């Protein structure tokens, strides 16, 4: 997202209602400095690490890396001074969609709290035409001199004299660009039903992009009310956070001025506008809130599912939080070009089309459940984030972690068909653990020294780990107590700002426990524990010895000797679905006694997999559980947790691939999608190692996979059966896809037949097995299959199918076809920038694909930086990771690291920004290499013993 590209000077629209600016009002010696605002782009951010001192070992990262760059060249960050704060904005913008520009006029009511002779605001990529000051209503404005820091995006305004505490008003006139970088006030492009190219304008202001649209105090602590007027062409729809209160024609009659009601107090990153040819469907909540879903023409019917869900969601949150949604309306709008999944602007929530729109006959179950989660996530932000906002980005998790948790609470309670808490285990818990097990992770409460670092923390720590820790705390305190604490927190800090300690205080008051003491270790230090457990029998009691240490994927030592307070739940074989005992582990090692456990009865920690920790069992304890895993008597949440822990322990060397395969083989009768997903992940590690060893080894490993998956695949078949739930079709897709990738010819033939019947006879492919079908065609269909997929992508109008064809085609084993795909997507720009990272997604399927993707990234890094807006763009950082993380040897790790050290396209600030993403990718490559070296002989022996 972010840009260091030159932004061309905006071309102004000719509009009678915008008065020409008297440029003689400008101080000439400051004009060039101000004008640079339209040509430079400084340090910015947004979603998904902090200053990591280039690629050195740092206090916040432990993974040693070769030094490169010049740390002293990093820009020293400076926040706005606290001697002044805004109370109200009046913003009037006049966008010209076809000229990609807008004129602006903004006033800011400012309270000066301490004597000062300057005021400072943020502005970026704006041509500031005049700045003036009004000290008393009715007084003449005074033109002011300014200077601009293009590194900090701070406009310093020199006051006519030292001013004592008082209220003043700043007045700005400016011109800006409707950019194509999906940040600030930007343009989005689409084609109508006749193939005509159209544009709409939308916004993305989180984290620091409101300054692209108007001068402002662009930090979350500065809350103010907003009046917004948008001057647009008569045939266009204009939207903002609040409801429309007037529409008046301009003097020439060609445009209209749309004025919106005054907003509640909110941070600048939550302001939003949208302008374009839009249509909508609407409904009302029980409390009378007008809900609308807006789309480009021809797609509004696809918004019905989200509209119905959003109505239910607002009503449910009103009750759960015991605070009514305070605005009269809430619009949800699908934007064709959108870098995030969605953005929670108060009253005008923006989404990618794929994250909001559902076609009942085309959307897969998995995607439909994701839409439900995203809709619920953004609407939860209306309380967590909008009503109560973090003071600074260090506490970003206060909004993202709780919105992530509440989305599951809502969908779990209102959409039981998705069995969403099962998917939570892999999508949230395992995802958060996967990143947090790296030495190059970061704490949930991560120090943000510079907003340039923000992009890298919109990641699985801020979202998935925070979400999982909230779930653990909710189970520990109980949902009613947890809810009571959250209500207290929201009511206490509504329309204001908070820090993590404020939340712990509210939860402590609600529970009567010291929640800060319990939870600070989980949010202030990176990583999480693995509990090593052993046992002994004492009559009818079981004595457990539990030792905690930080779980690190490379199996090495924790230099910080981290320690947590760990809520432990225990289940036993005689009553596997119940919690037999609860303990709180406070020391490095403790003994716990469980009464009434018969000799030979299994004992499992982390009952229900509610805790954010892994468990390493003695061989005796693990063996005792195998029969109940095989019979599925052990609950599904626990089966997943056990197998997922074993899969993660593979990398540490504490579990071998042979041990994992033994447990996986005991699950031959497994019937749950999420458990098979954990098995599939572990077998993927076996296949990745085998691929690095030799073609013969890979062939034998694939035969072992077929042996494990074949029976289940035969039982499932390919067709949906009457009465089965949504999870069964997803399981069918997972198992059959794995068989096909392992070279099982009958499965490949069946997928191929299904695809041909779809093209030739119009026989529909079930949405839940469509991606697997496309993947088989790309892998085994040669150029003919590739061309068919390309034609399908060119002719479809549905984004999920567009994305699935891209992911599938990137798996081709033919370099010429992969080159064609990359040229199509990147060089011809046939794929939207927000979706281009999917072109990397399947390349790790082959050695050729790995090497091609990495080489392509290296050769085109400048284009990627320009296209995505700089090194701190989340899109750029994710492409960087996808291009390298599937490698599996030390040579590649060094090559990857050295490239970024020596790349002359990158500045020292870029390297500083990329330190953690690069470190995480290098660490992932080395983990792959370590897994291979520790299991090479074990794999050879395993394959021989398996007679494959």
From Swiss-Prot:
* Annotated EC: 3.4.11.14
Q: Which GO terms describe its cellular component?
A: cell cortex; condensed chromosome; cytoplasm; extracellular space; membrane; mitotic spindle pole
Q: Which cofactor does it need?
A: Zn(2+)
According to UniProt, the reaction catalysed is:
Release of an N-terminal amino acid, preferentially alanine, from a wide range of peptides, amides and arylamides
* Main location, first listed in the record: cytoplasm
Check the record and name the CDD domains matching this protein. Answer: M1_APN-Q_like (cd09601)
Entry keywords, A to Z: Aminopeptidase, Chromosome, Cytoplasm, Cytoskeleton, Differentiation, Hydrolase, Meiosis, Metal-binding, Metalloprotease, Oogenesis, Protease, Zinc
Its localization reads:
Cytoplasm; Cytoplasm, Cell cortex; Chromosome; Cytoplasm, Cytoskeleton, Spindle pole
Tissue specificity, in the record's words, reads: Expressed mainly in intestinal cells in the posterior part of the intestine and in amphid sensory neurons and nerve ring neurons. Expressed in neurons in the male tail. Expressed in mature spermatids (at protein level).
Q: Name one Pfam family in it.
A: Peptidase_M1
Query: According to the record, what happens upon gene knockout?
Result: RNAi-mediated knockdown causes an arrest at the gastrulation stage in 30 percent of embryos. The surviving adults lay a substantial number of unfertilized oocytes. However, brood size is only slightly reduced. In the gonads, the pachytene zone is expanded in 15 percent of animals and oocyte nucleolus disassembly is delayed. Mutant 1-cell embryos have a delay in meiotic exit during which chromosomes fail to decondense after polar body extrusion and oocyte and sperm pronuclear envelope formation is delayed.
Amino-acid positions noted as binding Zn(2+) in the UniProt annotation, renumbered to this chain: 377, 381, 400
Positions of the catalytic residues:
378
Molecular function as annotated in GO: alanyl aminopeptidase activity; metalloaminopeptidase activity; peptide binding; zinc ion binding
- Residues engaged in binding substrate: 206, 341-345
**How is its cofactor bound, per UniProt?**
Binds 1 zinc ion per subunit. Can also use Ni(2+) and Co(2+).
Quote the PANTHER family the UniProt record gives. PROTEASE M1 ZINC METALLOPROTEASE (PTHR11533), PUROMYCIN-SENSITIVE AMINOPEPTIDASE-RELATED (PTHR11533:SF174)
Q: State the function annotated in the UniProt record.
A: Aminopeptidase. Required for the exit from meiosis, probably upstream of cyclin cyb-3. Involved in the establishment of the anterior-posterior polarity at the embryonic 1-cell stage by regulating the dynamics of sperm-donated centrosomes. Plays a role in oocyte maturation. Required for embryonic development.
What is the name attached to this protein's record? Answer: Puromycin-sensitive aminopeptidase
* Source species: Caenorhabditis elegans
The gene coding this protein: pam-1
